[in-house]
Regions:
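N-terminal glycine-rich flavin-associated loop
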Residues: 30, 53-85, 103-152, 162, ...
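A glycine-rich phosphate-binding loop feature that marks nucleotide/adenosyl-phosphate handling sites
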Residues: 44-47, 93-96, 152-159, 234-245, ...
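Ferredoxin-type iron-sulfur electron-transfer modules and their immediate structural context
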Residues: 412, 490, 498-507, 511-657, ...
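Terminal amphipathic helices with adjacent charged low-complexity linkers/tails
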Residues: 278-283, 303-306, 310-412, 416, ...
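Flexible, glycine/charged-enriched surface loops at secondary-structure junctions
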Residues: 15-17, 37-41, 88, 147-150, ...
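Iron-sulfur cluster-binding electron-transfer modules in prokaryotic oxidoreductases
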Residues: 525, 532, 549, 557, ...
């Protein structure tokens, strides 16, 4: 029985239209006739000028169609005006398939519906922009999935996967896209609509029949050449699948033996037709999975063992080499995961997965794997993982492989150009050994990972594409190609042709088949309108004018406000050694190099409830995702958006919805920290344009809060007046829907002069002393939080000091100044804090904070002020309230007499973005679980959307609410009766109060309630 799904799986919120500018007649027509987005400005085009490859070509413009009617209108206009068209999904191509001088049509924002689903037939029809992981999440309740599980599944689209003929980690079991696409509904270059599918049914449409006859004629004529020239390996994606009538792949394209004309479009990179709907073959979800991690003392042994391991019939065998292991260990999110998989210090590991209906059978397979490795001389080398969570965590590390490797600092980066050559398994060890020798010959090293099961290892030589990288790339490519030919492999095994490998199609297939491909292109697209210069008539791979780092690429001179010297280094590609911070050649002192860490792989285009990236989840706009912002910054700092650099309007617009959540700092494997870049951009803009009244009111809150506290009665009266408050909000630029913060008698006013005595260096043990750093908000607006924290700490037997001295203003983290880009003021606050706390830090006293964004700035931005050892010492002693309690409990120094909470059985916990970014969210849940009988339920949400003053600002209110409605507010409204809501961030609490009419509380307040006596 069929069930059709009309609503989109994800219906994005459209918030910020493209900036209007003087438009050509083409774009005036597009904007007039389309309901979707039309972008013609240079910054928008620049964000679509790159993908995850080394290339950059400015498109003519960008169209984001809202529906199928929009798509057809856009294609009609482009055809009438003789404009080339380039279909784009997630833009994660590593070979430049989605880069070109054309009208880019972005399917990912709106064209993402599930059109039809047949559970019994195990088929689904989707629009091209649907994300793979979204599709599989929707299919999961039906016990089905689409098994071409590529590593970019969280962001890649089905349309892009079909255009690329993607493969995935489990292709040894399920095949490639060509094995799993049943039909494609497409629009041809002449505007006609055709359905390409199985030839088991007669073709009746005249246009489709003409194409079929033409393809059959060419394929029949070239049959002998296809048999002779097409590599006999599973992974082979170069050129067109002209062997669809006489399959040369080791795995048959179809189950019934009938040819399928859709398979000619699969892997065609959008050069033949525009796919509007794709019908897929589904597979049952395996009931159980187990994972064996095999540790190898040498890389060669790992490669040699692959041919033996596949005989055990695993569904996946994936490689992680020593470089990727080392880089994973540097990432705090990945380190504990990878450590659990290691035995000693291996040079390589293989992830071997078994899946099926019988768990016992899989456990037997794991035992057989261990026996096999013992027979191969490696007893005890297998780490068995049967827990689903542990398996997923390790697969997530593997899936992040490219991004992890791209986290290398310095100008040299692993470059994609021979990363998916495929060779028969029996030659894999020798191929990798000899290719490594080629790298060494050219004074570089390669990083290896991925698909050992099918002889397709991703390897990227480390090259500096600013300098001699292009020359060495050409030389290495030639020698690698010779090895591939010797071993009868495929030069393009998985990632397609694009700009990088298009010129090698003729080398792989010879002049006859290359000419046949050109004939196919003319048959479908005689005017060369669909993605020109791909597969047929491609440019040279080393055409430097197409590089992201093109000739003349250079940053504008810039003196940053923060310290970026860690990125201004030189790296030896052979040894991996880095020079000292600040020793590189970056004239921006590391800032440009930090921006260039973004490799465009699109990990930030995730849609789940993790940390990154809330503004993208709300808007689905490339402008408002970390990748889009990084590209905007890169274009700006290199003068490609004009002479204004970071102070320009394009940068301001790109960062407009960035809530500085630091999700990218944690989740981006290359460590792109957009919150820190936003500080720099605001600082640069302030120097040119100054600050607004609203910005100054927010920034200087710590300075005038004492006055506001004394005037709290008058302010509360004014805030409650029905005329005064709205006028005040409108004058300042605040959202009328928001309630203004109220002030209270400051907590520290009662702490007294003795709150911060000069400590005695000769004093005894300091294990029972803490300094409670009461932030501006906890002091002047929510003093009950500070009182609760003091009560809990004193109940646990600690002597509590505070961050204030008699007659002085309390110490401040400077966070509000940072948010406004007033870095000099923030540094001044930090310097005062460091100088005052130095005696405590020298004695090892822990600094405990309540507000995550405040306390955690001491572990983050303070280190970028240039204050050296003082800042590092503070970072090592600064803990959030709950982190401190967990540490003390683990050390056996904490005893809290907690009792059950009357009338409260559950705590719904929302994590502040910075808590998540610094792995500080788990301690909140831990301490709450100390309360007897309390069920602790974390909310699966990203940023609450308030983000300090962001949600108060009139122009950002809608975006703020959209972010909150993604996960947080629905979860709060749906909580069980009597459940309390816990949120440590003051902004989070205000958002929950405004959006769900619920008063959330700080964890300290909950613990105070639970104290006995």
């Amino acid at each position: 029985m069929k069930s059709a799904v009309s609503p989109s799986l994800v219906r994005p919120v459209h918030l910020v239209p493209s900036q209007r500018a003087a438009l050509s007649p083409l774009f005036e027509q597009l904007r007039t006739e389309l309901r979707g987005d039309v972008h013609a400005d240079r910054a928008s085009r620049g964000r679509y000028a790159t993908d995850a490859s080394i290339y950059q070509i400015m498109p003519l413009g960008v169209v984001v169609p809202r529906d199928q009617d929009d798509l057809r209108i856009a294609l009609d206009i482009a055809r009438d005006r003789k404009i080339p068209v380039l279909a784009r999904g997630a833009g994660t191509s590593q070979c430049g398939q989605t880069v070109g001088e054309a009208l880019v049509v972005d399917n990912s924002k709106w064209l993402n519906r599930i059109v039809e689903f047949d559970a019994r037939a195990r088929t689904v029809t989707v629009e091209p922009g649907i994300v793979l992981d979204h599709l599989n999440a929707w299919l999961k309740p039906h016990g089905l999935w689409f098994p071409v599980d590529v590593s970019t599944g969280a962001q890649c689209t089905i349309g892009g996967m079909a255009g690329n003929n993607s493969c995935g980690s489990r292709s040894i079991e399920y095949g490639n896209m060509v094995h799993n696409v049943l039909a494609i509904d497409a629009i041809l270059a002449d505007g006609s609509a055709c359905r390409f599918g199985s030839l088991a049914q007669p073709v009746t449409d005249r246009r489709t029949l003409d194409l079929l006859h033409g393809v059959e004629r060419i394929a029949t004529r070239e049959r002998d050449e296809l048999v002779e020239r097409v590599p006999k390996v599973l992974r082979r994606v170069a050129g067109y699948n002209l062997d669809l009538f006489d399959c040369q792949n080791p795995r048959a394209y179809t189950d019934d033996g009938h040819a399928n004309l859709a398979h000619l479009l699969v892997g065609s990179e959008g050069t033949l037709a525009y796919s509007r709907q794709i019908t897929l073959k589904l597979a049952p979800l395996p009931a159980h999975k187990t994972l064996g991690v095999v540790n190898f003392p040498t890389f060669y042994q790992a490669m040699d063992a692959a041919q033996h391991i596949v005989k055990l019939k695993p569904v996946a065998v994936e490689l992680v080499d020593r470089t990727m292991i080392a880089l994973s260990m540097e990432n705090p999110a990945f380190r504990p995961v990878i450590e659990r998989a290691l035995v000693g210090q291996p040079q390589a590991i293989l992830l071997v997965e078994f899946a099926g209906e019988s768990r016992d059978a899989q456990l037997t397979q794991l035992d057989r794997l261990a026996e096999l490795m013992a027979d191969l001389g490696l007893p005890g080398s297998v780490v068995k993982m049967t827990d689903a969570g542990a398996q997923k965590a390790l697969w997530d590390v593997r899936k992040a492989g490219l991004n992890i490797m791209m986290s290398m600092k310095g100008d040299g980066k692993p470059v994609s150009f021979i990363e998916d050559c495929a060779v028969p398994l029996e030659h894999l060890a020798e191929y990798t050994r000899r290719l490594t020798e080629v790298f060494h010959k050219h004074e570089t090293e390669g990083t290896w990972y991925a698909h050992a099961s099918v002889g397709t290892l991703h390897v990227r030589p480390i090259l500096d594409m600013r300098r001699d990288g292009a020359t060495r790339m050409r030389e290495i490519a030639g020698e690698a190609a010779a090895l591939v030919r010797e071993y009868k492999g495929a030069y393009s095994g998985e990632h397609g042709d694009g700009l990088c490998r298009g010129e090698w199609v003729a080398w792989q297939y010879g002049p006859r088949l290359n000419a046949a491909f050109a004939e196919i292109k003319r048959l479908f697209d005689p005017d060369n309108r669909f993605n020109p210069d791909k597969i047929v008539n491609p440019p040279r791979m080393d055409a430097r004018e197409h590089f992201r780092f093109a000739p003349g690429y250079a940053a504008l001179p810039l003196q940053p406000a923060l310290d970026w010297s860690a990125w201004n280094v030189t790296r030896n590609p052979l040894t991996g050694e880095e020079t000292e911070p600040g020793s590189g050649t970056d004239i921006t002192h590391g800032l440009a190099s930090a921006v260039e860490m973004c490799n465009n792989n699109g990990h930030c285009r995730k849609f789940d409830a993790g940390t990154m990236c809330p503004s993208y989840r709300a808007t689905r706009d490339e402008q408002h995702v970390t990748r889009g912002r990084a590209n905007t910054l890169r274009l700006a700092v290199t003068g490609q958006l004009g002479a204004d650099g970071l102070a320009g309007a394009d940068v301001k617009a790109a960062l407009d919805l960035c809530v500085s959540c630091k999700g990218c700092k944690r989740d981006c494997p290359t460590g792109v920290d957009m919150a820190r870049f936003k500080i720099e951009a605001r600082h640069a803009r302030n120097r040119t344009h100054g600050t607004t009244l609203r910005e100054r009111l927010v920034a200087y809150l710590p300075r005038y809060a004492p006055w506001a506290s004394r005037m709290r009665g008058a302010l509360a009266f004014a805030n409650g007046m029905p005329v005064v408050a709205p006028v005040m909000k409108r004058w300042i630029g605040l959202a009328p829907q928001r309630a203004l913060p109220t002030f209270a008698r400051p907590f520290l006013a009662g702490a007294g002069a003795a709150s911060m005595p000069a400590p005695d260096p000769q004093a005894g043990s300091i294990t029972r002393e803490v300094l409670l750093f009461v932030d501006t908000f906890s002091n002047y607006q929510e003093p009950d939080n500070a009182r609760a924290a003091r009560a809990v700490l004193e109940a646990a037997g600690y002597t509590v000091h505070f961050n204030v001295r008699q007659g002085e203003r309390p110490l401040c983290c400077g966070r509000t100044f940072l948010a406004a880009g007033l870095v000099d003021e923030a540094k001044a606050e930090a310097k005062r804090t460091l100088d005052t706390l130095r005696p405590y830090l020298e004695r090892g006293v822990t600094i405990v904070g309540l507000e995550p964004s405040c306390l955690l700035s001491m572990r983050d931005e303070f280190l970028a002020y240039g204050y050296g050892d003082d800042a590092a010492r503070l970072a090592g002693h600064a803990l959030l309230f709950e982190e401190f309690l967990v540490r003390e409990q683990a050390a056996g120094r904490l005893s809290l007499p907690l009792r059950a909470l009357d009338g409260t059985a559950e705590a719904l916990v929302h994590g502040h973005c910075h808590q998540k970014a610094f792995d500080a969210f788990t301690p909140v849940q831990t301490v709450l679980r100390w309360i007897p009988g309390l069920k602790v339920s974390p909310v699966e949400s990203s940023c609450c959307g308030m983000a300090g003053s962001f949600g108060y600002e009139a122009e950002h209110y809608d975006a703020s609410q959209a972010m909150a409605e993604l996960s947080l507010l629905p979860a709060v409204r749906a909580r069980a009766d009597g459940a309390i809501v816990v949120a440590d961030g003051t902004s989070c609490r205000h958002q929950i109060r405004d959006g769900a009419q619920t008063q959330a509380v700080h964890v300290a307040r909950v613990l105070q309630r639970a104290l006995q006596g």
